[in-house]
Amino acid sequence: MSKIDVAIIGASGYTGGELVRLLTRHPRVNISTVTSRKNNGEDLSSLHPNLQDLDLKFTNPDTKDIDADVVFSALPHGVSMKLVPEYLDNGARVIDLSGDFRFSDVSVYEKWYGMKHEHPDLKAVFGLPEINRDKIKDATLIANPGCFPTGAILSSLPIVENKLVDRIILDSKSGVSGAGISPNNNTHYPTCADNIKPYAIANHRHTPEIREQLRNFGTGTVKVSFTPHLVPVIRGIITTNHSFLLKNDVSASDVHDLYMDYYKNEPFVKVLKDNNIPLLASVRGSNYCQIGGISLDDEDELVVVSAIDNLVKGASGQAIQNMNIMFGFDETEGLKELGLYP
């Protein structure tokens, strides 16, 4: 069985470590390069203690010396955009996990990320397989979705595309690993333990990403409000999706059936059959998105709940899912592990 060579750029963070963890059990992959500028020469286990006994060290090669079929860029936004064109020039296909290439209109990126885009003409395919599978197959550059947008979009698509709602309010709660590996006051134990903290209210960078993708469906004018919260768990995002139905002859059971039918062929989206409420613990460590808790009150307010692991379906697992599609592998290859409940 032939293998492809994979390079992971910026592997010192949590998403980089997850890429290594998941790719080591992928039968079609050879990890050829794992980079970290600050940790050059060190064993991966110096930062990722779960990656013991791997014959891999952090390196810091020149971009031109990175020889790979596919490059995963786990660099921060603003940094990734500078190097992605060089990887493409080397002949690699690139999956970028930053926000640098997620927007069709570069002015939206510049407004929300507060920096000028250095390669505005370089366009990527938005890497959410559930909506862009055919485009992903032939893409040379994939913009891997953000963690919050993944759960938010998947919880919204059926009702938006079927024009059942025109406004959505998203309340998302994320584990602290979503804030990255570098410690700060928000993720300091005395600050985040026994606490829930809303943040970036009305101005989170993932808001326009959610809006752009949902407006490609339905009427194209759906309004989206998004508020994230930091909660004292390590992994996972649970999103509660609130909307008001435009039709009063639709029941919660009808909506549940709609979701079941919409996602029936999706390997990693599981609409809970008994409409149970998704749990973070059920998806931890997995590439699955669970959807359930679909409820309708007496004023036609609809609630839909989704749960993902922010580091897997929300980042590294989804990136590998995209790689599988790009190279014609089974889409689920290397990603079949179930959640780590309890």
Swiss-Prot record:
Biochemical pathway: Amino-acid biosynthesis; L-arginine biosynthesis; N(2)-acetyl-L-ornithine from L-glutamate: step 3/4
Record: active site: 147
Its biological purpose: Catalyzes the NADPH-dependent reduction of N-acetyl-5-glutamyl phosphate to yield N-acetyl-L-glutamate 5-semialdehyde.
Gene3D superfamilies per UniProt: Dihydrodipicolinate Reductase, domain 2, NAD(P)-binding Rossmann-like Domain
Reaction equations catalysed: N-acetyl-L-glutamate 5-semialdehyde + phosphate + NADP(+) = N-acetyl-L-glutamyl 5-phosphate + NADPH + H(+)
Localization in the cell: Cytoplasm
GO molecular function, one term: N-acetyl-gamma-glutamyl-phosphate reductase activity
Family according to the record: Belongs to the NAGSA dehydrogenase family. Type 1 subfamily.
Biological process, per Gene Ontology: L-arginine biosynthetic process
Enzyme Commission number, as recorded: 1.2.1.38
Keywords per UniProt: Amino-acid biosynthesis, Arginine biosynthesis, Cytoplasm, NADP, Oxidoreductase
Protein name (Swiss-Prot/TrEMBL): N-acetyl-gamma-glutamyl-phosphate reductase
GO cellular component: cytoplasm
Enzyme class: oxidoreductase
TM regions (residue ranges): none
